Amino acid sequence: MLLSSPTNEHTIELAQQYAQGEVCYPVKFIYGHMQELAEKNADYIFMPSIHTMKHEKSGVKHNYGCVYMQTAGRLVAKNLRLEERGIKLLSPVFDLDFGKKAMASAMVQTGTELGFAPPKCMAALLTGSAAVKKYTDSMEAMGKELLDSLRPDEKVLVLITRPYDMSDPVLNMQIPKLLLERGCKLINLEHLPGHSIDISDEYPNIYWPFGQHILSGAKLIKNHPNLYAVYLTNHGCGPDTMLSHLFRREMGDKPYLQIEVDEHYSPVGVITRIEAFLNSLEHHKTVSAGSAIDIKNVSVKHYDVKRLDTDTAPVYIPYLGLYSAMAADYIRSEYGRDVMIMSEISEKQVELGRTMTVTKEYVTFTGLLGNVLETAETAGGKFNVVIPENEGSEADGVFARVISALIEEKGLADRVGIISPMLESLPEKAADTQKLFCGMLAADIAYSVPRDRRSEFICEHIPDEAELTELAKRASLIRSEGKTLRITGTPMSIYSLGSHILDFLEDKGYILRYMPLSEYFRFLWNDSGAECKKLYEIMHKISQALGNNSPFAADTDVLINAADERFKGFAGANGRYRYAVITTEENCSAVINITPRYENVSFVHELSGMSCPVPIHRISVDGDINESELSSLNSFLYYI
């Protein structure tokens, strides 16, 4: 058996040579380690895919690995051409949320691929599981022993990060060594009983187990007068862009050091920051607890989630093109609330949001935050904002909770509430799912016609099925001449942040086929196991009525099969649907894919070698009207 070397200069060199795209630093190192093993003539390379993970105190439906953990092994193997080189990838899919049986099945299958009998595989698995538990218990016991022995004025630093950052000599930037050389007492997150803390009442939708552990660790550190955090995050990590805000919230006025791991980091800069932090701690007086400390006795505050059916305050909803008016009508008619549509996200709002950012947050988050803050400045009295959640595993499902935390930080929590319906649960929990779906279809129909005729198809109220069918038949009669461009991406990138791009294209006379939001949600709900047969029947009927103007897939099964081919079981930002739409699109001149800059799912799609039957141009929006971006788009259009 071969192990790759501890990360060294050669690993970094290989990573820089083979890694593609703006992936996070740890994923870049996977390229280096797997290429090293390939150069050593390995027959097999073991790199599992982490789909879900177990976390005992979690309250979410599924505890997901990030989008890279779900896909990295397969994507890196493809880019390194391992199969062509005669090297087999062993990449069992770990679905630890489904219990020990699922884990055992995945590992036994891997063992049998290597020629071992199932009983021998099970024995090895049990031995390994026992060793992990023994290690976990011993680490927490060591931590307790240290904390019990501390003098009242002693300070202990706790390294907070993911396990792979903790142990890797490059990813941890030698910080443990630097701290120990300076005489610090140092432990890490594994020495604290973070797994026994239930934070789900305060953070109900943190679906990353490492994120849950980091936040429970933050509570333990905040609660113990002798503990101070050194928090390492990863450049390019979507989850870290959200967790950093919540970690800061937990620390409050207690000093801590946060350093972002980046391939361009300066060792001198790291040392300077460490020494400045240690110097500040010398002047920070440790407050004696006065008695024995129960470190687990942490404060977990109830997160007050507002509800449409019980909270009577006026409601604001984010701008999402024509879909916003349909959503507003739905809320008014079903819940009797006063509803206002927020303005389209502007450059000014993005800049306002950036006054509270800490790293490279997606512009969909930054713009939405700025939009909420500006609304709070102009709206009088109390109001609620609808910011949907999803079940994971991209950063977007946590936007609502983080924006709520930042509203609290700004002192606006008494005026501004957040309503965050779970998107996957809408078929079960919406007051009238079919009506909501018909509202999406109404906007889909309006977007199926050219801009100069669109006003004829905009509805004031949500039509019923029969009215939708007649509307679609009318739309089918409109004929347009010119090249057709398929518009794909994330809904907010297309319908709010990317409107200047769409105007640019329509000004040039291109026919745009917009990604239909009804199909987007129907696919998401199908993936989550919801019963959507009736909704599909209505959508199919509208698609047929639209004829050649239909933006819908002719056969939904084609989309599902395309998604399963490369991203079976994948969870994150409806990435399966977005991938399938692009890779099956044939009835247009080109695809324009609009996504937020730095979005991890977009990078995963690119790394997958996503092929499109027609030319594709990718645009990463970042909240401004970028002339070079439009120039690049113009050049692309010239050749189609």
List where the protein language model places each region.
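An N-terminal assembly and electron-transfer interface module characteristic of large anaerobic redox
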Residues: 1-640
